[in-house]
Amino acid sequence: QKTSRTTKKGNAMKLNEIREEEDKSSTPLILLDSPKNEPKPRLIGLFGNLDEEKTEEIVHSLFILDGLDHEEILEDPQDLTSAVKETIYKPIDFHISTWGGCARGMFAIYDAMRALQQRTDIITYGLGKVMSAGVLLLAAGTKGKRKIGKNCRIMLHSVRADQWGPIHNLENEMEETKLLQEQHINALVAETHMTKAHLKKLLDRKV
């Protein structure tokens, strides 16, 4: 018995045409994008070591997200040509799981976060491990919106340097390292309830 065509008169259809109709009516099992009526995630992450490339990526992502998906409140909601009374910026989620890395890169991201927090919240999440340069970034989240996983480990140590060259270069680098250390402590004091004396005591443990 042949099955390549239907047998009813006037309603003959090839099987490949039937399959085509079935394909058109089928529903995809995997959604590659959020439904249009759901908010898009405003998410960035720092995973692994913080180097120059990741610093650039995170800073650019912060400013790009800041310029997207905000809501303008008009003085007269019924008049679309009226002046903007207020702009509401939606929060940014920052997931952190890092061994640490470059201190200067840390400060670049930190300064970007501080600039954006003048108008939007940045919610930080510590996951797995937050060490070295990652500690300040976790602490730099909007106060009251800094979160940490139950099994996340935190590690803080003094600024480290790897220097070589003529003695005057080494002296200059040492002064720069001391300055970075002082900046790091001052930033942590500003973002936490820890005092400078307590932080210096922690850093003197030579982790």
Where are the regions that the model predicts?
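Terminal-region recognition feature
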Residues: 5-207
